[in-house]
Amino acid sequence: MLLLKKQTEDISSVYEIREKLGSGAFSEVMLAQERGSAHLVALKCIPKKALRGKEALVENEIAVLRRISHPNIVALEDVHESPSHLYLAMELVTGGELFDRIMERGSYTEKDASHLVGQVLGAVSYLHSLGIVHRDLKPENLLYATPFEDSKIMVSDFGLSKIQAGNMLGTACGTPGYVAPELLEQKPYGKAVDVWALGVISYILLCGYPPFYDESDPELFSQILRASYEFDSPFWDDISESAKDFIRHLLERDPQKRFTCQQALQHLWISGDAALDRDILGSVSEQIQKNFARTHWKRAFNATSFLRHIRKLGQSPEGEEASRQGMTRHSHPGLGTSQSPKW
């Protein structure tokens, strides 16, 4: 699919702008109707003056989206350029964000979570087959296509995606609680970082709180570097061993031993009947409501901040001794009382 930038003096000659859908770091997304038809798009409007120094990021997003055609990935339909703006006409998805939809459900089971994760795995496996690493998978980037109950889930936001020309990538990026250990260590990394993020998302979908959490970034990073998480009681008491086994394979600290997307798709929790049909909506929705209003989980992240922290603390990147001696772990967001550190 080759999408050339179509030149226009005024985007209103191409689309009727209806309303604002949202905004990002340097763009706004508008609901727009194509002139001469009833076709609606999500129009990403990027001022060129905001692009100075960021041109490569946007060009990369366009390059990635041009290569993609998958039923569970939001499509780029057209690209327009005016003297002042760049416009990306994206497939319109109207079903809302993942967590919001879970909260609105009448019931929610492991089988529902398994079905969701399976769809995302299929989309990410497709990206990986093209040599594309998403690099910023998180619940906010998982949207429902329609408001209907049987709607499919869609992967969105390819601003940080990268086409993996060689074997590994080197630029650290992502969102704090979802980044893989090798990314924090600033080692070359690849597709396995997406699998790790899917492990974090799968964990949250089954209990409503994140596996790695602390108000202090250095301690959060230390937990991630050690892959230090637990299946806390009572939140995990009714979750199957198969689900826990699946998550362990995705949250494997060593990227060489971590499941690939294909291996994850073949796990019985995804491909078989291992996912339980017990309703877990009450517990999960309560924890989602409690934990994901936190702006902490929406901050942008660059791993250089982590390196500054550990240098000040005199730690190695593995973050062992200084964190044992100098930091106290805050209460886990899913738990009512402070826990002892998980050393």
Swiss-Prot record:
One of its GO terms (molecular function) is calcium/calmodulin-dependent protein kinase activity. GO terms for cellular component: cytoplasm; nucleus. It is found in: Cytoplasm; Nucleus. Residues 15-270 form the Protein kinase domain. Isoform 1 and isoform 2 are phosphorylated by CAMKK1. It comes from the Eukaryota. One of its GO terms (biological process) is signal transduction. Its EC number is 2.7.11.17. It holds the Pfam family Pkinase. The modification Phosphoserine is found at S338. This is Calcium/calmodulin-dependent protein kinase type 1B. It comes from Rattus norvegicus. The lineage of its organism: Eukaryota, Metazoa, Chordata, Craniata, Vertebrata. The gene is Pnck.
